[in-house]
Amino acid sequence: MSSSDLPPLGFLAVEVNIHRPPGDPYNPRTWPFPLVHELVPGSQEKQIVSKETYDAEFINRFVASGKKLAEKGCVGIITSCGFLAMAQRQLSERIGVPIATSALVQIPSIRAFLGPQKIIGILTYDGERLGDTHLQEVGVDPATVRIRGLPATGHTRKVIQDSVKYDSGEMEREMVDSAVRLVKSIREEGREAGAVVLECTQMPPYAAAIQEQVGVPVYDVYTLGLWFYSGLVRKTPASWIS
């Protein structure tokens, strides 16, 4: 079966017009299976990247768009911002097909892999707005993680908020530096950093560079999507067939 013959994964797109290179979950070249987009109206950065609970109208728009993807034959759905972890339970209850809203949903499994003592670092787009509510929504004890945001006046924020031209070299330097600082801060507590989870969907293209510098497992929406889809659509590897 070729990748084009596989059932599609749905993607809830938001109203943020930015460059999305391979590795970004919006880009079809990121995935080894078909991807179908559905734009959610009223989904700008300031509405999504929030520490406040989403209101009913906001959730309803995501539900409506998610149901459209289900009607198009999508076997599951992912989204374009890790802050949508705060909507995980509501969306999974109402859309009708499995949905993985955020890279953060992997953390309970990562915790099981690592054992109870190691700290999981979260690198996020905005460290001021990502907090306990997002974590608890996906079953994460805030005491077991440490959060670090990208610089408030850095390149990534300027690209998304101010439409500054995307510079991949600058993005990589900023993300690698922030991840190194995150892991260093954990070690300065006298704790061991077990893994880093990249919250932002702009981060996966730079995950390998981050891992090279921090030296621990690195998870993101790409690792989530591959795991998620592999259970939705099982394929028997050719090497298994005699």
Regions found by a protein language model. Give the residues of each.
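A short, acidic, amphipathic alpha-helical segment used as a generic capping/interface helix at domain edges
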Residues: 171-192, 205
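Conserved mixed alpha/beta catalytic, RNA-binding, or beta-rich assembly cores of soluble enzyme
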Residues: 92, 99-107, 112, 116-126, ...
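Short, well-ordered secondary-structure micro-motifs
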Residues: 22, 112, 132-135, 209, ...
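C-terminal functional extensions of proteins
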Residues: 199, 203-205, 219-242
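Short, acidic/small-residue loops that bind anionic groups at enzyme active sites
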Residues: 90-114, 211-229
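N-terminal glycine-rich anion-binding loop in soluble enzyme alpha/beta folds
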Residues: 1-59, 126-129, 133-167
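Metallocofactor- and cofactor-centric catalytic cores in central/energy metabolism, strongly enriched
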Residues: 2-3, 8-14, 33-76, 80, ...
